[in-house]
């Protein structure tokens, strides 16, 4: 069976998954290996990778913007002014009240979720200066965007509609968005996310799925052999050909890039700068406070610093309550 990387560590730590041996033929790398490892134990075999990318409308842009400075210039074009609100522009849109989508801003400026590569829940970096700088930059965009972008439930649909109707030139989203854009017959391109104003990469979360073995499997040795088979280069190539999901196997990944598919190439390139999503159980305490932090800051309800401090305080308290601060 398959499980998302961010669930593998917690499920393994809770005793729901058996340990897995990574076969040398799996051709994994350090990033994907870290996504299936918790406390030095491996609970899954990397299957596919994913991360956020930039989609742009080829009917509106000749090439993908390479820097956020270029996106800022694009947002000055009156062609993208939002008709229903004076002074607002939709040239570029992103769902940055969603922590998954906004994390690249924070991490690219030096913020982080947990220390020691996502394994130390006692060290939370969502209110350090880098994280605050990232939130402050998001606020400059929300000053340009229509009020609807602050609707935490409706923002994603608003962004997709604007992009599909040709009112937005570029958006940040994941590989899963491609199917709906194809169905809507949008003439889109895919590229890596532009570099941040500080010149650093937009370090979004790196994720995907792994093959896992349930604890207590009736035939664990046979299950391990099947996992070994599924992660071989040939099988990973076959999986890509069937699903278009980017293989975790590095040799199969090169094969996929060689297919000259823009989405595949962008995901692989962007994944080089991705930060592995923490897979420890304590990660479950982060999502809601982080989303509140972003909304409170970009809506002006709180300063970026106060919003970040309050979020970290709540995360620490919840970890203490649920996990005893261990």
Whereabouts are the PLM-identified features?
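Glycine-centered hinge/linker elements that transmit conformational signals in sensory
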Residues: 75, 120-152
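Short helix-initiation/N-cap motifs at beta->coil->alpha
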Residues: 6, 69, 149-164
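Hinge/lid segment of periplasmic solute-binding proteins
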Residues: 3-52, 63, 68-74, 83-87, ...
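Long, aromatic- and glycine/proline-rich binding clefts that accommodate carbohydrate-like moieties
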Residues: 191, 240-289, 296, 320-326
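Short helices/loops that flank or line small-molecule/ion binding pockets
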Residues: 14, 73-80, 157-171, 292, ...
